[in-house]
A protein has these predicted regions:
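Single-stranded nucleic acid-binding surfaces, predominantly the OB-fold ssDNA-binding core
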Residues: 1-108
Length: 108
Protein backbone atom coordinates (compact mmCIF):
# COMPACT_ATOMS: atom_id res chain seq x y z
CA UNK A 1 0.00 0.00 0.00
CA UNK A 2 1.32 3.43 -0.92
CA UNK A 3 0.89 6.20 1.62
CA UNK A 4 -0.59 9.46 0.39
CA UNK A 5 0.16 12.67 2.25
CA UNK A 6 -1.11 15.30 -0.20
CA UNK A 7 -2.70 18.45 1.20
CA UNK A 8 -4.84 21.24 -0.24
CA UNK A 9 -5.15 24.13 2.19
CA UNK A 10 -6.92 27.49 1.82
CA UNK A 11 -6.69 30.21 4.39
CA UNK A 12 -5.15 33.52 5.40
CA UNK A 13 -1.55 34.26 6.29
CA UNK A 14 -1.34 34.72 10.07
CA UNK A 15 1.87 36.76 9.97
CA UNK A 16 4.56 37.83 7.53
CA UNK A 17 6.70 34.92 6.30
CA UNK A 18 10.14 34.27 7.75
CA UNK A 19 13.23 32.93 6.09
CA UNK A 20 15.54 30.31 7.58
CA UNK A 21 18.04 27.67 6.57
CA UNK A 22 17.37 23.94 6.74
CA UNK A 23 19.86 21.60 8.45
CA UNK A 24 21.24 20.68 5.01
CA UNK A 25 21.85 24.35 4.12
CA UNK A 26 18.80 25.00 1.90
CA UNK A 27 17.12 28.40 2.12
CA UNK A 28 13.45 28.15 3.01
CA UNK A 29 10.44 30.36 3.61
CA UNK A 30 8.25 29.55 6.63
CA UNK A 31 4.73 30.86 7.08
CA UNK A 32 1.54 30.08 8.98
CA UNK A 33 -1.83 29.68 7.27
CA UNK A 34 -4.93 30.11 9.42
CA UNK A 35 -8.26 28.52 8.55
CA UNK A 36 -11.59 28.88 10.34
CA UNK A 37 -13.85 25.86 10.60
CA UNK A 38 -16.97 24.66 12.30
CA UNK A 39 -19.89 26.38 13.93
CA UNK A 40 -17.70 27.95 16.59
CA UNK A 41 -15.47 29.48 13.89
CA UNK A 42 -12.44 28.12 15.71
CA UNK A 43 -9.13 29.05 14.04
CA UNK A 44 -6.61 26.37 13.10
CA UNK A 45 -3.00 27.26 12.32
CA UNK A 46 -0.86 25.25 9.89
CA UNK A 47 2.89 25.63 9.45
CA UNK A 48 4.01 25.72 5.81
CA UNK A 49 7.53 25.67 4.37
CA UNK A 50 8.52 26.48 0.77
CA UNK A 51 11.94 25.94 -0.80
CA UNK A 52 13.86 27.34 -3.78
CA UNK A 53 12.19 29.72 -6.23
CA UNK A 54 8.77 29.06 -4.72
CA UNK A 55 10.12 30.04 -1.30
CA UNK A 56 11.61 33.24 -2.71
CA UNK A 57 8.31 34.14 -4.38
CA UNK A 58 6.40 33.47 -1.15
CA UNK A 59 8.82 35.62 0.84
CA UNK A 60 8.42 38.47 -1.65
CA UNK A 61 4.63 38.27 -2.29
CA UNK A 62 3.08 37.07 0.96
CA UNK A 63 2.05 39.46 3.72
CA UNK A 64 0.00 38.94 6.87
CA UNK A 65 -3.71 38.86 6.07
CA UNK A 66 -3.31 37.75 2.46
CA UNK A 67 -5.36 34.77 1.31
CA UNK A 68 -3.47 31.74 -0.02
CA UNK A 69 -4.12 28.30 -1.43
CA UNK A 70 -1.33 25.78 -0.80
CA UNK A 71 -0.89 22.39 -2.44
CA UNK A 72 1.77 20.26 -0.81
CA UNK A 73 2.63 17.22 1.25
CA UNK A 74 2.95 16.49 4.94
CA UNK A 75 6.33 16.19 6.60
CA UNK A 76 7.20 15.42 10.20
CA UNK A 77 9.74 17.73 11.83
CA UNK A 78 10.99 18.03 15.36
CA UNK A 79 12.97 20.41 17.51
CA UNK A 80 14.44 20.50 20.99
CA UNK A 81 13.94 23.58 23.15
CA UNK A 82 16.66 25.09 25.39
CA UNK A 83 15.43 22.95 28.31
CA UNK A 84 16.04 19.82 26.23
CA UNK A 85 12.36 19.06 25.68
CA UNK A 86 11.47 17.36 22.38
CA UNK A 87 8.73 18.95 20.24
CA UNK A 88 7.36 16.96 17.27
CA UNK A 89 5.54 18.92 14.57
CA UNK A 90 3.77 18.25 11.28
CA UNK A 91 4.42 20.82 8.53
CA UNK A 92 3.15 21.21 5.00
CA UNK A 93 5.88 21.32 2.36
CA UNK A 94 4.49 23.59 -0.36
CA UNK A 95 4.69 22.40 -3.95
CA UNK A 96 2.35 25.08 -5.34
CA UNK A 97 1.08 28.33 -3.80
CA UNK A 98 -1.65 30.59 -5.20
CA UNK A 99 -1.75 34.14 -3.92
CA UNK A 100 -5.16 35.78 -3.44
CA UNK A 101 -5.40 39.50 -4.23
CA UNK A 102 -5.16 41.88 -1.29
CA UNK A 103 -8.17 44.14 -0.70
CA UNK A 104 -6.13 47.12 -1.92
CA UNK A 105 -5.37 45.23 -5.16
CA UNK A 106 -9.09 44.55 -5.70
CA UNK A 107 -9.93 48.24 -5.31
CA UNK A 108 -11.82 47.81 -2.02
Amino acid sequence: MNDLSSVLLEGVLAEDPKTSTSPDGQARCNFIVTTVEGRKKEPFHFGVVAYGQLGQKCLYDLKAGRGVRVVGRLRRESSTDPEGEYHPEIKIVAEHVEFRPLKSERGE
